[in-house]
């Protein structure tokens, strides 16, 4: 009965789009935090899709970074997460510039003033 209950609970979590366990989300935060330049990870959403995991997040980095540099950081983060969670993991990273005084800083605007 205990084994059947465990299977039912696990499957219900998948069917109801439940987040992955806290220790798994901590692993994700640790992996992302190891990437140089990451200021903050927020809006982390995780779930299981069949035998794969889905990881969506917002990451704050230096706003003066080029698109090429941001893409390189995303590639490193995605590779590290796939090493941990498997090659079929769905990973979506949304980059945002670091906020100062509650607002996004625009480095180009500041340079031209």
Labelled PLM ranges:
Residues 1-113:
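Alpha-helical transmembrane segments and adjacent TM-loop junctions that form the membrane-embedded core
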């Amino acid at each position: 009965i205990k084994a059947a209950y465990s299977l039912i609970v696990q499957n219900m979590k998948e069917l109801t789009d439940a987040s992955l366990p806290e220790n798994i989300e901590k692993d994700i935060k640790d992996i992302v935090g190891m990437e140089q330049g990451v200021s903050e990870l927020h809006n982390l959403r995780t779930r299981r899709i069949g035998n794969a995991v889905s990881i969506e997040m917002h990451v704050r980095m230096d706003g003066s970074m080029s698109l090429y540099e941001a893409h390189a950081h995303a590639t490193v983060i995605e590779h590290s997460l796939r090493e941990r969670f498997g090659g079929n993991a769905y990973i979506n990273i949304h980059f945002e510039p670091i906020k100062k005084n509650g607002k996004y800083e625009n480095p180009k605007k500041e340079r031209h003033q």
